């Protein structure tokens, strides 16, 4: 077991840590910014629309192409993929684009295939997060990933960066028909790790991660402000909040 603490809080007797991916140990702004641009370009192409709506469609998906940042109140920050598609489908009607959830799923999957063939171009780790993961791993902690991104995509990321020895289990979007917020995917990770929720901590960058952990019986979630939401806002959800995982002391 290990203990984690900062000048503001302490969590003791940890055996297992579950991590969110994007915004937690992968640079979310760059990753999802590039993904959003590819999705929007494909939609403009398929529906034969003018490129003048490119910026507006990016903003609908919660990304500002002018700043290169994801919006803290954008749908990508707040919801899982199925909800994002449902909202985006209705936003597209404003631009005379009429589609279905199934068609948008197909477009998103098509773009993901292209995206992950060029992973080295689009994916950047958060160095201090990877260092933290390596430290707790060296102390014998069981580590899992629970993400609303695809398991296939996450596995490719792990393979690309040669992180196979860092993670014991990956639960992704296709691992369950239930959303991440339901807590079911998190329960799956706990079960596969044979982990006790009482000695498990979730680490993520958004309220979604807190909700997911709570619904799985995990009492403590550390929220890190390396994603779309600043630390003060995250403190409204969890008392265990940091600007960076590098500020956490491990013993």
Question: What do the PLM-derived regions correspond to, one by one?
Answer:
Residues 17-19, 106-111, 120, 129-158, ...:
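Substrate-recognition element of Asp-dependent hydrolases with the DxDx(T/V) motif
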């Amino acid at each position: 077991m290990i203990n984690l603490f900062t000048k503001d809080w302490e969590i003791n007797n940890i055996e297992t840590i579950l991590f969110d991916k994007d915004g937690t140990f992968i640079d979310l702004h760059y990753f999802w910014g590039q993904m959003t641009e590819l999705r929007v370009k494909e939609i403009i192409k398929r529906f034969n629309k003018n490129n003048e709506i490119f910026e507006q469609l990016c903003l609908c998906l919660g990304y500002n192409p002018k700043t290169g940042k994801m919006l803290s109140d954008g749908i990508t920050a707040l919801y899982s993929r199925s909800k994002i598609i449902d909202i985006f489908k209705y936003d597209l009607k404003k631009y005379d684009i009429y589609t279905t959830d199934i068609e948008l799923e197909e477009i998103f999957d098509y773009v993901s295939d292209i995206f992950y063939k060029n992973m080295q171009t689009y994916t950047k780790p958060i160095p201090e997060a990877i260092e933290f993961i390596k430290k707790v791993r060296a102390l014998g902690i069981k580590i899992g990933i629970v993400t609303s991104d695809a398991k296939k995509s996450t596995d490719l990321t792990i393979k690309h960066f040669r992180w196979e020895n860092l993670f014991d289990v990956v639960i992704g979007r296709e691992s369950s028909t239930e959303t991440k917020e339901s807590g079911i995917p998190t329960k799956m990770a706990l079960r596969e790790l044979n982990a006790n929720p009482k000695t498990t901590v979730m680490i993520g960058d958004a309220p979604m991660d807190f909700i997911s952990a709570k619904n799985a019986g995990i009492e403590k979630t550390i929220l890190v402000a390396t994603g779309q939401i600043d630390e003060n806002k995250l403190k409204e959800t969890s008392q265990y909040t940091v600007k960076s995982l590098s500020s956490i002391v491990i013993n």
